[in-house]
Amino acid sequence: MSLLLPPLALLLLLAALVAPATAATAYRPDWNRLSGLTRARVETCGGUQLNRLKEVKAFVTQDIPFYHNLVMKHLPGADPELVLLGRRYEELERIPLSEMTREEINALVQELGFYRKAAPDAQVPPEYVWAPAKPPEETSDHADL
């Protein structure tokens, strides 16, 4: 009995092992494309599909109210996506959320520069009122404001 696999089977096995590691959770912002990012919305269905995605549902129901300029929009049958918007509400990019954990989504939103308030009704610092999302190098330059 031979343990050697044909090349096609080896390729399929390798692809199956690598695919989970390269899922949508590896999103990296392209700051050139996201120039002018000021707000975002999470588009998702409100029912059965969201109920299957416990991590995404927890983010939508519990975390979104804490973020400034991040809202939720119910769309029947929609897969959960983070829609990044510019100053005039023009769509800059869509990021699928289905494969991400609650922790990964929160990390992404914070990496994009959205301000997380201490409480849903808390005041927002002046530097985050009009343009909550900035590249990391810009936020570090203005940390003293």
From Swiss-Prot:
Question: What is this protein's record name?
Answer: Selenoprotein M
Q: Which SUPFAM superfamilies match?
A: Thioredoxin-like
One Pfam family in the UniProt entry: Sep15_SelM
Q: Which InterPro entries match?
A: Sep15/SelM_sf, Sep15_SelM, Sep15_SelM_dom, Thioredoxin-like_sf
Organism in which the protein naturally occurs: Homo sapiens
The Gene Ontology biological process annotation of the record reads: adipose tissue development; corticosterone secretion; hormone metabolic process; multicellular organism growth; response to selenium ion
**GO CC terms, sorted:** endoplasmic reticulum lumen; Golgi apparatus; perinuclear region of cytoplasm
Q: Which residues form the active site?
A: 45, 48
Q: What is the lineage of its organism?
A: Eukaryota, Metazoa, Chordata, Craniata, Vertebrata
Q: Where is the signal peptide?
A: 1-23
Q: Where is this cross-link: Cysteinyl-selenocysteine (Cys-Sec)?
A: 45-48
A molecular function GO annotation: oxidoreductase activity
